[in-house]
């Protein structure tokens, strides 16, 4: 038989889709054919999650109000959160979760040919106490791109309450500060540490990204290697390559004693 058959690349569609190319590369990527992001935002109360979400969906330097054809927000707390009042004014909002809401969005999108489907966003904000294990939201986490959902954002105070399906399909991870729950942070570091060279590297990256209250770590898991940012501003790590000295970071709050990190390649920024 000679040489074996070779895998040929699949050609990109001939028509150009430049929607989303205007988005800053430090933000979760939502453009391209079949593109989109499942973004998890994890943080305690009063750590700036509402401000972050308001900026993402209202600030013209981010996605703004004109990026998506439709935005659906489900939030148990939005009616009582003064920070989110402009989101409530701008978008279609329910202060509860229901599978019927998700089902209705899916059925509406299925009315269109794929190329004609509206480009939409769904935000599920602090709903996990009312979202069951078999909820349609979790099923959507592995299929959202089929319905041209370009942004599926899920915010939670408790990482371990987020379905494994959502965690496995997460494209972008944002962790706010301060993060007082030691066990939660260790769980996150165990789950995502390998992509940056281990748990200790992950904790050092988080600490370096969040020196002040309301700072956050953004991990772009769509990139290869994974890119880590301080807020949406500064690239601080790519995979195991850290652009700071991890040995200078005090990790005592996570371990009860300082840990030496010796597995990263460091490079001055």
Language-model features: locations:
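Short, flexible N-terminal segments of the mature chain
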Residues: 94-98, 237-240
């Amino acid at each position: 038989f000679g040489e074996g058959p070779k895998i040929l690349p699949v050609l990109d569609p001939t028509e150009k889709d430049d929607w989303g190319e205007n988005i800053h590369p430090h933000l979760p990527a939502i453009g391209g054919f079949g593109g989109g992001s499942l973004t998890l935002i994890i943080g305690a109360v009063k750590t700036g999650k509402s401000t972050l979400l308001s900026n993402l969906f209202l600030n013209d330097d981010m996605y703004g109000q004109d990026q998506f054809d439709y935005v659906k927000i489900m939030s148990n707390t939005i009616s009582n959160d003064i920070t989110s009042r402009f989101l409530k004014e701008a978008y279609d909002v329910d202060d509860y979760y229901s599978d019927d809401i998700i089902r209705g969005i899916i059925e509406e999108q299925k009315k269109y040919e794929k190329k004609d489907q509206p480009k939409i966003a769904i935000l599920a904000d602090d709903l996990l106490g009312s979202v069951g294990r078999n909820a349609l939201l979790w099923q959507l986490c592995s299929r959202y791109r089929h319905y041209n959902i370009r942004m599926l954002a899920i915010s939670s105070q408790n990482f371990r309450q987020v379905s494994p399906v959502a965690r496995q399909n997460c494209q972008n991870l944002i962790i706010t500060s301060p993060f007082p729950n030691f066990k939660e942070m260790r769980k996150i570091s165990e789950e995502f540490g390998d992509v940056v060279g281990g748990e200790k590297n992950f904790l050092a990256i988080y600490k370096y990204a969040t020196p002040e209250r309301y700072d956050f770590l953004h991990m772009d898991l769509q990139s290869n290697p994974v890119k880590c940012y301080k807020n949406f501003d500064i690239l601080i790590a790519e995979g195991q390559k850290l652009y700071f000295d991890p040995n200078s970071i005090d990790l005592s709050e996570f371990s009860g004693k300082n840990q030496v990190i010796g597995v990263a390649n460091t490079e001055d920024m």
